[in-house]
Each structure stands twice: as C-alpha cells, then as structure tokens.
Amino acid sequence: MLESKLENLRQFFGELDRALIAYSGGVDSTLVAKVAYDVLGQNAVAITAVSPSLLPEELEDAQAQAQWIGIAHELVQTNEMANPNYTANPENRCYFCKSELHDTLQPLALALGYNYVIDGVNGDDLRDYRPGIQAAKERGGRSPLAELQISKLEVRQISQLLGLPWWDKPAQPCLSSRFPYGEEITVEKLQRVGRAEIYLRRLGYNQVRVRSEQNLARIELPPEQIQQFVQDVSLGELVQTFQNFGFLYVTLDLEGYQSGKLNRVLTK
C-alpha cells in the first residue's frame, strides 16, 4: 500500500516538466519536495514564505532539510500582517493567509515557467476545517498528497521509508493558530508566543503549544508528559520567564495537547 502510494506520487511529478513547491519545512511539504526533486531534479524548486508567524527555528529547519534533499530553495516575504482581514483573526483567517501566499508565489511561478504552485496539504486535512485549502484551489494550486488520498500517518510512513530523518517531526502550524478566533493578532503577540514555545522546546518538550488568550498563556503538552512536566520544571522560574515575555498569567491545560483544539468553538 505504501509503495503504491509512493509510486502514485512519483507519477504525479512525472507528468510535470517542472514543480514549484510551497515549502514550510513541515513533514508534509518536505515529503512533496523530496519526491519532486527525486523525479524532476533541478526542475523542482522549494520556496518558503517568511513572515512574523513563522518561527525562526522553523525557517532554519526548512533550510537544512532542503539542503539535505538537494532541492533548490528560495525565500520570499509575505505580508499577511498588513491585511486587516487576517489580523482581525476571523474563523476563516487561514483563507487570507493562503491567499497572500499564493498571490505571492503564483506570479513568481508563472514568470519562471511553472504551471502550478504545489503544496503539502494531505488527505486528512480535507476532513478538518481548513479554509486555506479553498484559497489555494481558487488560484489553481495543486495538492498531490490530498489528491492521492495520502493521510498524515502515511506521509510519516513514506518519509520513514525514504529515509528522511525528520519523518516523525511534530506538526508546527503557524503561530497565528495559537490565538482564539476574534482576538487581534499583532507582531508583538506572535513574538511573545514564539519565545515561550522556544523556551519550552529547549527544556525538552518538542510537542508543545502555548495558546495565547489576551494576557494569559495556556501551555498544552501531550497528556502523558504533564505529570513529568510538573515534577521536573521549576514552575516559579517558568512563570517568571513567561512574565518576562509579556504574559501576566500562566496556566497548564490539564486535558493536554490536541491539534485544532481552538476549532471546537466552530461546532457549538
């Protein structure tokens, strides 16, 4: 099954002369970039959008991973923070983010002779609330993992099969996803959340989210790590550090980390 899906992915790129990959450095777009490069070689390029919602560490990872693959890698600046429809953080915020991404990449792709902007949306994403997918479709974007019904688990399994060292890399959506819908997003808030998550990663907690609700930080960890976290971490030092970052209050979510938790309000 995995081999057949990998072969389907190779065939997808085999039908193209060139491929431009919207490359975040996550496990999904990294698999897409790897297979595109294996099939097309120098006719494949990965482009990463740089904005305040991208952690500097994630950019460094993307650069290192692209170098490991061998694919040409370029950076572009996106300016979604200048769009009040985005910074107001409505329920369809991701639509405006992906619109900015594709409106930036599509003219570049056409100028360089690429017919499509190709992303790492996977089959599971189609079953979640992802308004950004619609923005990509409206602009002619292609999502081979979704088109071939390759799930997140299969992405990881195929990545492991191909020997990609980061096949089990934790998901790392943009920092704007840390805020409840309706709370305005600012560069300062993004930086505050970013610093807090980097601090926790350096303590050894890689699968972590710092949800920001006004002046309150809510830490989410995998449920099985919560008890150990409370035992091992100096809570007083943690609170002081977070307050230095700009938070007034620091809490630990006892339910633990769950992807898309802030989307619960959409079903009520």
UniProtKB/Swiss-Prot annotation:
Single Gene Ontology MF annotation: sulfurtransferase activity
Pfam families: NAD_synthase (PF02540)
InterPro entries, per database record: LarE, NAD/GMP_synthase, Ni-pincer_cofactor_biosynth, Rossmann-like_a/b/a_fold
Entry's family note: Belongs to the LarE family.
Protein name: Uncharacterized protein slr1717
